[in-house]
C-alpha cells in the first residue's frame, strides 16, 4: 500500500529507540503513497513484484553495510511488507537476523529451507487462510 503514515510512525519509533530505521515506499516508481491505502493497494498490483523484491534485498544489503550498522538486520512488515519480511528471511539464509511479519504470505515454498532467522509471525487466531499458509512452513 506504500509508505503510509502508520509505517512512517513505526520507523520513527524504531529510530527513536536507537535503531537504523528504513521505511521504503514500494510505490515510489508510481509517484509514491497516494494518501489512502485503498488507492495504494490498487497501485501496488500494477508493479513488478520481482523488481520490488530485488529492491528490498538491495536495501537490506545496503543497510547492513552502513558504517554505523552492527551487521544485524531486523525487519518488520505489514501486509505486503509482511511478505517482504518473509521473503528476506528466505531468499538468503544470512540476510535477516530476525523478522516480525504482520500478516503477509510466506515466500515461495522452494525457499523455505533457507530460513534461519527467527520469525515472530503475527496473525489472527481465527484467520483460516493464513493458518493454511503457515502449515506449509511447519509452524
Where does each model-flagged region fall?
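Conserved alpha/beta-hydrolase "acid-adjacent" motif
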Residues: 128-134
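Short N-terminal helix/helix-N-cap motif within the alpha/beta-hydrolase-1
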Residues: 4-8, 31, 83, 110, ...
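Structural detector of well-ordered beta-strand residues that form the stable sheet scaffold
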Residues: 22, 99-100, 120
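Short beta-strand/loop motif that positions the catalytic acidic residue
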Residues: 115, 121-123
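Primarily recognizes the serine-hydrolase "nucleophile elbow" in alpha/beta-hydrolase
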Residues: 57-116
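C-terminal catalytic histidine-bearing segment of alpha/beta-hydrolase fold enzymes
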Residues: 139
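Glycine-rich His-Gly loop
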Residues: 1-2, 79, 104, 124-125
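Serine-hydrolase catalytic machinery in alpha/beta-hydrolase-like enzymes
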Residues: 1-65
Amino acid at each position: 500500500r506504500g509508505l503510509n503514515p502508520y509505517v512512517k510512525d513505526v520507523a520513527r519509533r524504531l529510530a527513536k529507540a536507537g535503531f537504523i530505521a528504513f521505511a521504503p515506499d514500494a510505490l515510489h516508481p508510481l509517484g509514491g503513497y497516494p494518501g489512502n491505502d485503498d488507492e495504494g493497494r490498487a497501485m501496488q498490483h500494477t508493479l513488478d513484484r520481482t523488481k520490488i523484491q530485488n529492491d528490498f534485498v538491495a536495501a537490506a544489503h545496503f543497510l547492513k553495510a552502513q558504517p554505523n550498522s552492527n551487521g544485524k538486520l531486523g525487519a518488520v512488515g505489514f501486509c505486503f511488507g509482511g511478505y517482504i519480511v518473509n521473503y528476506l528471511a528466505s531468499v538468503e539464509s544470512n540476510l535477516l537476523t530476525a523478522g516480525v511479519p504482520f500478516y503477509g504470505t510466506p515466500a515461495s515454498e522452494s525457499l523455505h529451507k533457507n530460513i534461519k532467522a527467527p520469525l515472530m509471525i503475527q496473525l489472527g487466531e481465527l484467520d483460516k487462510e493464513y493458518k493454511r499458509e503457515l502449515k506449509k512452513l511447519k509452524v
